[in-house]
């Protein structure tokens, strides 16, 4: 019986999208869902803050008179800034604030070919005598780029910032059983996508499928390997191994020598796991700014260090409660990682 062609149904609500693909042949739910999820998490282009200049600040470990947040906290807040480009090329955002009160992202002066998606984001809190002047550079890119990779000398005392460009915040998928008529051994793929608002879930999914299609298209243009063809063509029937007639040399059967097992040195190497080689940085886990700051205050600055801790260890970290612990576990699980038992 001919299988029904799969159909895709979508439900998009702002920066959240749910996509259902069915019916699929048994096993194809995972075959399709896993690569799309990996591409969504790693390869969708987006924008991010790459450097910041703050007036009268020389380095990221400084404090600013009249500003409650130190420079590290300001940078963490700026990493949450979401900017949507309407034209290519880096953009410079300028902020000038003075006097008591909150400073929100809406206070930035933004070029006409860009917009801030989250204008209510709190950047800083100023005292009555506080003053904050800064320039923020926003660029386009893919995945995670460390600060040293895009350090710029365009502005003296500019502080480079490690950037997570992906507009996709989280991706989850699972496969269910489904049926069509009497055929019950079919898959239903359910894919859920959360974005930061600079790109919609449908747009991100379309881009992921385009990337996957381009990568697989190479298999449609296979070129012959002359060296391989010539070696096979030159082979005679006698040179081709035939298991029915092949025999070992007589010396193998007649030799009285036995292998010296005592000389063997068995030194097995541990098989590397995802825990040993994290695939993402601490910033790339998608943790909230508050949780990320609490971890870094305790010197937990890598995924490897985080995964070496247990639930009990993390509860001792100031600012980490049950809700924060659940958030950390959920974000680690998205990358196949977990805390120590």
Curated annotation (Swiss-Prot):
GO biological process per UniProt: DNA-templated transcription
Domains (record comment): The N-terminal domain is essential for RNAP assembly and basal transcription, whereas the C-terminal domain is involved in interaction with transcriptional regulators and with upstream promoter elements.
Signal peptide start-end: none
Organism annotation: Deinococcus radiodurans (strain ATCC 13939 / DSM 20539 / JCM 16871 / CCUG 27074 / LMG 4051 / NBRC 15346 / NCIMB 9279 / VKM B-1422 / R1)
Residue segments, region Alpha N-terminal domain (alpha-NTD): 1-223
One Gene Ontology molecular-function label: DNA-directed RNA polymerase activity
Region of interest called Alpha C-terminal domain (alpha-CTD), as start-end residue ranges on this chain: 268-341
Record EC number: 2.7.7.6
Protein name in the entry: DNA-directed RNA polymerase subunit alpha
Record Pfam families: RNA_pol_A_bac (PF01000), RNA_pol_A_CTD (PF03118), RNA_pol_L (PF01193)
Lineage of producing organism: Bacteria, Thermotogati, Deinococcota, Deinococci, Deinococcales
Keyword check for Magnesium: no
SUPFAM superfamilies on file: C-terminal domain of RNA polymerase alpha subunit, Insert subdomain of RNA polymerase alpha subunit, RBP11-like subunits of RNA polymerase
């Amino acid at each position: 019986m001919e299988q029904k062609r799969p159909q895709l149904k979508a439900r998009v609500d702002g920066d959240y999208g749910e996509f259902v693909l069915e019916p699929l042949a048994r096993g194809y739910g995972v075959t399709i869902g896993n690569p799309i999820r990996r591409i969504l998490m790693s390869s969708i282009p987006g924008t991010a803050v790459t450097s910041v200049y703050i007036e009268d600040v020389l380095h990221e470990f400084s404090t600013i008179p009249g500003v409650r947040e130190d420079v590290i906290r300001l940078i963490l807040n700026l990493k949450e800034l979401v900017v949507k480009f309407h034209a290519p090329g880096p953009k410079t955002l300028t902020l000038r604030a003075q006097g008591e009160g909150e400073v929100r992202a809406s206070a930035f002066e933004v070029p006409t070919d860009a917009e801030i998606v989250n204008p209510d984001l709190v950047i800083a809190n100023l005292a009555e005598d506080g003053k904050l002047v800064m320039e923020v550079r926003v660029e386009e890119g893919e995945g995670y780029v460390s600060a040293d990779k895009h350090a710029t000398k365009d502005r003296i005392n500019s502080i480079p910032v490690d950037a997570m460009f992906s507009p996709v915040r989280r991706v989850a998928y699972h496969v269910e059983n489904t049926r069509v008529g009497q055929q019950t051994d079919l898959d239903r793929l359910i894919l859920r996508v959360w974005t930061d608002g600079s790109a919609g879930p449908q747009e991100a999914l379309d881009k992921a499928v385009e990337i996957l299609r381009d990568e697989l298209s190479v298999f449609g243009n296979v070129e012959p390997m002359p060296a391989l063809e010539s070696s096979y063509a030159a082979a005679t029937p006698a040179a081709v191994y035939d298991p029915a007639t092949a025999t070992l040399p007589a010396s193998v059967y007649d030799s009285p020598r036995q292998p010296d097992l005592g000389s063997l040195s068995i030194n097995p190497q541990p098989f590397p796991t995802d825990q040993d080689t994290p695939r993402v940085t601490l910033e790339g886990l998608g943790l909230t700014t508050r949780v990320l700051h609490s971890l870094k205050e305790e010197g937990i600055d890598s995924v490897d260090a985080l995964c070496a801790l247990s639930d009990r260890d993390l509860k001792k970290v100031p600012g980490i409660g049950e809700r924060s612990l659940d958030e950390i576990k959920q974000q680690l699980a998205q990358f196949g990682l977990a805390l120590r038992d």
